[in-house]
Amino acid sequence: MTATTYIPKSVFIDTNVLIDHLQMRSGHENADQILALGKNHTIRLCLSALSMADIVYIMRKTIDEKNIKNTFNDWIRHFIILPVAEISISDACRSGNPDFEDAMQLSCAEMEFCHAIITRNKKHFEPYTDIPVFTPEEFLGKIVRNS
């Protein structure tokens, strides 16, 4: 029996997963693996410009400015950086999602027709979209690597 490989074409990665990677928080190994999948073009990895602004704000006291700029330049080369448009703000206002920032992230993912969302906070995404939502662990568990 052959295992079925689940590899969505386009995947949106939420800010909290990116911060796991940057701060090497618990679970960062999963975030690292997902970013590697994007860098080697196994998946088309998308993140929003809002995530990048949030990361600078959240990590401003713990990360060197040169290092974060180098990281962002690397991400720009390998990943799709989605703009936050007026429609994302309007969508977030109408969504009923209690987390405005996550509602804007979701709008970005939907406008890009992403096939999956990876976040550690599924409750701010799943009730508001038909896009499959995974934790990093769940997402990696869905991918069967052929050796």
Show where each model-derived region lies:
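Short, well-structured N-terminal submotif of metal-dependent ribonuclease cores
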Residues: 1-47, 60-67, 127, 140-147
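Active-site neighborhoods of divalent-metal-dependent phosphate/nucleic-acid chemistry enzymes
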Residues: 6, 80-123
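A residue-level structural signature of the nucleotidyltransferase/glycosyltransferase Rossmann-like core
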Residues: 10, 44, 81, 117, ...
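Alpha-helix capping/helix-boundary segments
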Residues: 17, 51, 88, 105, ...
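Short amphipathic alpha-helical segments and helix-helix/interface helices
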Residues: 32-35, 72, 105-106
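Short acidic, glycine/proline-enriched helix-loop-strand junctions
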Residues: 66-89, 93-95, 125-147
